[in-house]
Amino acid sequence: MAARSGSRPDESPPPLARADGVTKRYRRGSEPGRVARALGRSSPPKVTALEDVSIDIAQEEIVGLAGPSGSGKSTLLHLLAGLELPSEGTVTFQGTDLNTLSTRKRTRLRLEHVGIVFQHFHLLDSLSARGNVALPLVELGVPKKERRKRATELLERVGLEDRVTHRPGELSGGEQQRVAIARALVTDPTLVVADEPTGELDTETGTRVLEQFERVAEDRAVVLASHDQPTLEIADRVVRLRDGRIDEEATVRAPSRTDT
């Protein structure tokens, strides 16, 4: 790919998100994901979920996080998404050190620029699929007409155009997961983080959800944490964690979706 005018051929754009020497400690019992369960009863009052981890997330790159339960995958996702701050080290997003932001500004940045899909996602039974997808836009103060339009468009993109007015109880597990994916993308985020996005789905449904996820995640940076090999196979790069440290890193396929 030809270098852009005014830039050197070996110059690469700055990372969208960066964790630099991050360590995260928790009081026992407050760890995210499966870290607490994996540590067991003999763990000390404070546990180290991540230790001296550094990783760059490029724009328009899919990064897979692999590793056993308790390896730190969920914790790293939380830090990259700005849901938590590191005990040591820095996490930057678009060049801004998240440690320097107030809780209010960090929440606003996350709502505007980060889409989050968790394995145990929560949909409100009192709202339709469209209402659930539009929730982040409500938080951002987007007018109702625009909320409905954008939520409907996202549901169409994940193949749920005939489920727009259905409530969660009227949807299958795979359909509910696609609603959660649409909700994560409705603000047009530049970064999407997903923790075991197909963890509770059967193989066939999981495959369909992954296909939809890969399609709608184009032109965004995506970080996926999973034990599931098919999920990791959609990544450009897989980073394996063990005991809170990066154990291995490998390129899985072409470096960038924009180069093909």
Predicted regions and their residues:
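The feature captures the beta-strand-to-loop junction immediately N-terminal to the Walker
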Residues: A66-P68
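Helix-to-loop junction immediately C-terminal to a conserved catalytic motif
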Residues: A81
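Conserved ABC transporter NBD signature motif
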Residues: G89-D97
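Short coil-to-helix segment of the ABC ATPase nucleotide-binding domain corresponding to the Q-loop/switch region
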Residues: L124-L135
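Conserved ABC ATPase signature
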Residues: R167-L171, E175-Q177
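Conserved catalytic motifs of ABC-family nucleotide-binding domains
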Residues: D188
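Catalytic Walker B motif of ABC-type/P-loop ATPase nucleotide-binding domains
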Residues: V192-D195
